[in-house]
Amino acid sequence: MEFPSKEILLFKENILNLYKSLKNSYSNNERNLFSHVEDVISSLEDDLDFNIGHKPNIQPVCRFLDVCISETKNNDLKKISETINSLKHFLNWRLNDNYKNVFEDNFFKNESFVEIIGPSGLLICDNIRVGLLLLGDHVLYPSHSHQASEFYTILSGSSMWQINSGNFNLKKPGDKIFHDEWVTHAMNTN
């Protein structure tokens, strides 16, 4: 297979546009999110090298990927889903080894992540990671925390999200979720 240079650059452009639209929708009062958005925009505006040695890999949860892509209805997110579809055979889906002894084995049949832009992504960037988290039906991603701040956009389906010890709240396609470093969070797919 030929390396998907054009598709990767289109994905980068679509993600950059998503983050630029975010920049205008949050106030400076939301300092940590605003700083996160600024860092991602700055990094994506740089020329990034292709990771020619990148090796594709699939996980059991990838059985849901085509459905997730086809169910993306939001016009802005549809562009991202279309580029994901064009890249899907090049993606290196992984399991988080940090949770191997924490979560049940069945969890790993219904969860995986892929880094598209980042230190080991299709496009190399040392200071940010842009990728996908794929969860199957009826999956509880237990409460956890980590050093990385994260920004999620729901592409398809729905999910219940919990931040700290608050209630789970329904998130639908197009909804955006941000949590800062070490903020405890959990999700449960419907």
Q: Which ranges hold each PLM region?
A:
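Extended repeat-based interaction scaffolds and adjacent low-complexity, acidic/S/T/P-biased segments
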Residues: M1-E2, K6
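Conserved short histidine dyad/triad with adjacent acidic residue
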Residues: F113-S120, I128-H146, N167-F168, E181-W182
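Residues that recognize and position ribonucleotide moieties
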Residues: D126-I128, Y152
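Short beta-strand segments in beta-sandwich/barrel cores
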Residues: L140-Y141, G157-Q162
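Short acidic-glycine-tyrosine-enriched beta hairpin
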Residues: F151, N164-A186
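Asparagine-centered strand-capping/turn motif at beta-strand->loop junctions
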Residues: N188-N190
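Short, basic/aromatic beta-hairpin or loop at an interaction surface
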Residues: Q147-S159
